[in-house]
A protein has these predicted regions:
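Alpha-helical, largely C-terminal catalytic domains
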Residues: 1-181
Length: 181
């Protein structure tokens, strides 16, 4: 919770100063400010005996699957909310930081960040291929959080503007799923 408050404070300071941080400055704070780490910790509380003290210690060690899932959340969010957040006055996002740091166009920044999202998915897949201290159900929880971000942010901001597209996606996953034969 302290890390989340520090990240919010850092982003507020950048906003108030009109400062566009480097990617190396921005991403660590921005990934924390998604609240993803806190959400993933709290989500383990309802999993029963499968979650042990060792599981929490594993989670607090900042494993690659959690970092990758949180990065997917931040990158996909910034890619689709950039224009809306600029209109309402918001801290510089990943796109702004990337454009300034590398001197590229908005589209080039978006393309590079989409590639980073793909790389984060590869990291998640890699974590399923090698043994970890975490139970499989916990790994699946991290995977599912990343899937939710993909559902909400692929192509549009389904979190801020929930509409027919998101409702249809949710219905296709839970109400009318494809049967597995």
């Amino acid at each position: 919770l302290k890390a989340l408050a520090r990240a919010y404070f850092e982003e507020a300071r950048w906003f108030n100063e009109g400062y566009t941080p480097t990617m190396e400055e921005y991403l660590p704070a921005a990934i924390v400010s998604t609240g993803y780490h806190m959400l993933s910790t709290v989500s383990l509380l309802g999993m029963g005996d499968i979650v042990t003290k060792d599981t929490f210690e594993w989670l607090f060690s900042d494993p690659k699957i959690v970092r990758a899932s949180a990065a997917i959340c931040r990158l996909m969010d910034d890619i689709v909310t950039n224009k809306f957040e600029k209109e309402r006055g918001h801290v510089a996002c990943t796109i702004d930081c990337y454009m300034k740091q590398y001197g590229v166009s908005e589209q080039e920044a978006v393309d590079a960040l989409n590639k980073q999202v793909v790389d984060q998915w590869k990291d998640i897949n890699e974590e399923f291929l090698r043994p970890t201290a975490a139970p499989m159900a916990v790994l699946i929880r991290a995977l599912n959080f990343a899937k939710v971000m993909d559902l909400l942010y692929k192509g549009d901001d389904g979190y801020t503007r929930v509409g027919k597209v998101v409702k249809d996606k949710i219905a296709s996953h839970f109400i009318d799923p494809v049967p597995i034969i």
